Amino acid sequence: MRRAVLTVLCAGIAALSLGAEAAAAKVSDAKLAADLKALLGTEVRAFRAACKRAESSRDPRYVAPLIELLRFPLGEEKERVVAALGALGALDGGTGAGIGRGEPWHEAFAWLGAQKDPKLPPGFVDWKGRLFAARVDPAMRRFFDPEAKSRIPVERIQWGGVKKDGIPALDKPERIAAADASYLTPEDRVFGVSVGGETRAYPLRILDWHEMANDVVGDTSVSLAYCTLCGAGVLYSGQAGGRTFTFGSSGLLYESNKLMYDRQTLTLWNQLTGEPVFGPLAASGLKLERLPVVVTTWAKWKKDHPETRVLSPRTGFDRDYTPGKPYGAYFESPELMFPALGASPKMAGKVQVFALVLGGVAKAYPLADLPKPGAISDQVGGIPVVLAVDETGAVRAYERKDREFGPVLRQALGATFLAEGNGRAWRLGEDALIGPEGRRLARLPGHLAYWFGWSSFYPATEVWSKP
């Protein structure tokens, strides 16, 4: 008797399961498309009906569009979207990557990112473009071409809170002599750049507001791409594949990293890797060349390079260029502002590192562990390197070939020197280490970043530790 009852119960459960699957199967592509259209619209009754059908459907294809909607103000309709996501299981076990605790959007976004094969509705890319055009900026729709190749999951592209070019790039900005830069204090931090014998300083108090400078330095077109969220300023050559590119801010993020776009094709590029990831050039194989850049104090840069030019505060934009004005609280907090689901847990997300990629190998050096001042010898991708850290904490990396350098930096005649074990001195330059008889060891293109940003795109990164 008990066996018969158990058989009946099992059959009932199986029937319920099959019934749920059948119910899910009843949401045809046409009905789904109609609901997604209603979710884009302004007709409240249709919006609510679509949410209700999503809630009862058990169809996972509703999840990604509902998550997109949660990113925007919905008023009292937010409860209906959250209820639908809950019924679809997208609020079970989501962590939000340690940010926005208790916020449904973060939880659901983390849940979706954890799915090995997320189910997306037909036409999702075009739908997302229409949503962003309606809710943020009509110009954003052109980024979401359904025919374009994408090297990243489109459902994980996030809105960064601004319109396209809402963070305006600086194009060949006005420069002034160091002596005329009275608006800067000695401790203000700057990106120091030297290309073709010409030096330039880009104060962070200005770049915090613009995040991109398209410029010409030493007759070379360059773009200084700065992601404030991941703490990384990367200097790129503007030349790639025989073309010259200039860049702007798309207003979009991936892994809490700025997606910049080129103005020539409207392709989205990864700011940290210099690669096109979504759009006309995503399949091109292009990659921007990294160039050396250093973050140091204005006093140190001006002392080492009295001939330097520096950005004028007359940028043409009405901004408060007080240091730390737009992101000071974020820089001081250990919290992230947006999800970075691919970040490595080896270190806290906002640990600052100096990062290098050589011979196909990525390596990160936690700033707090580096000598200040001092030098370390190491290998990256089988290439011998030496990192020199000055008294401001500025880090420069050079090839060292078969030479062995001591751990001490010395000051003499207004310059900084490293010494080989045999006592021969090498002067730190922006392009190279310069040794006896004019010998040169090339500077390498490393830069700073928060650990979460770097490890999201270089998950196999080796981490240097103190001997």
Q: What annotation goes with each model-predicted range?
A:
Residues 1-4:
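Positively charged n-region of N-terminal signal peptides that target proteins for export
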Residues 11, 22-23:
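Cleavable N-terminal signal peptides
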Residues 23-27, 45-58, 65-69, 76-91:
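Structural detector for internal amphipathic alpha-helices that build alpha-solenoid repeat scaffolds
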Residues 26-38, 59-70, 92-107:
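Amphipathic alpha-helical scaffolding segments comprising HEAT/armadillo-like alpha-solenoid repeats
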Residues 40-44:
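HEAT-repeat alpha-solenoid elements in large eukaryotic scaffold proteins
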Residues 67, 90-467:
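Mid-to-C-terminal functional-domain signal that highlights helix-capping/loop sites
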Residues 74-81, 96-97, 120:
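Boundary/linker segments of alpha-helical solenoid repeat arrays
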